[in-house]
């Protein structure tokens, strides 16, 4: 599934489940929280901190999906076509790197 379809899927889910988009600042705070959860798993599972027993059942993939969901929400709210932006960024990185 491409990014444009993911953006559409998130928008449909929000509109069909009786929820709404939080404002952009709230979603930015949500994104920070979700990235923190990813960081906790990585730092404890792959870094120098020991992984607590309560952290062993945390799913990195689910937490990354939470990050992606909020990023898609922010893109939808601000009118960003992430597919176009991602393709442009990859072309730039390919040329530059």
What would you call each of these model-derived segments?
Residues 1-64, 68-97:
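Flexible "arm" and connector segments at domain edges
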